[in-house]
Amino acid sequence: KYRRYRKADGSLMEDVTSIFNPSSKYITVDRTRGRVTIYGYNSATGSYDTPIKSMICSVGNPISYTAAGTYKIGWQLKKKQMRGEDYVCWAPYVSQIYDAVYFHGVASSTPDLNMISAVDFNSLGSPMSHGCVRLTAIDAKWIYDNVSSGTTVRIGDNLDYPLTNPTRYT
């Protein structure tokens, strides 16, 4: 069902962007597993059957959940101020998914992005956001740099997951 790449030792490659990084991509967000998977378009098969990168994420908490559905990436910003009833923060590498829901790096309490919450960072993989899809800054930057406006994003639960779990950053 999926085209996969393996290392010389036979283990599955989790990030194949160095050898296969097509311009046309498709993204899934699995709310249950806290995983983002990016697929590349395979012109030989005419489908998005090549998983090229996997990321750990936090989606909305039970009060401000991330809505399931199919969306298109909108605008993108290097940094955006976020506001809620009880918070103001700045998020790096913001890519709009729908309305005020974005892919973005773990937010900072300061505009220079030098102070991120250890709780937020260490909670990646669990539903903790205010509805956005929260990523490491490295992964949010990858989406910002490699995914164009108009790319399809599917958000759901228990989605097919062809890769092993991504490694947590420490």
Feature-to-residue mapping (PLM):
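Exported/periplasmic cell-wall-interacting domains
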Residues: 48, 65-68, 80-170
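A general sequence property marking short-to-moderate contiguous segments
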Residues: 2-12
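Gly/Pro-biased beta-strand-loop elements
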Residues: 10-114
